[in-house]
């Protein structure tokens, strides 16, 4: 009976030790895009890719979004544009455009899309995807 408090004390010490030395898991949202930083991709482009991933998950049309590495590295950053688009006149500091691929929800077909992202004060202000259809060759 006298050893019962000793046993509980040891169990409490062991659990507190494990709790205090538990490793913190890294933020998955940052870890997913860490490779882009190592590839020397500009920070606004990385923010746009992350915004597209979040946005596509919520849209009813697409369920998956992929930007190939060479398209991310070749993203066009337009600093001269002051509005996101004529249809959506959000004031922005820069517009980032890159070609990507999106998969239609419920289907297996990947579609080429032109992605545009507006950045204002270092934050993503607007995103848009438009299908990029190859012109048909008429002979």
Show which residues each predicted segment covers:
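Mitochondrial intermembrane space
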Residues: 20-139
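Bacterial N-terminal signal peptides
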Residues: 7-15
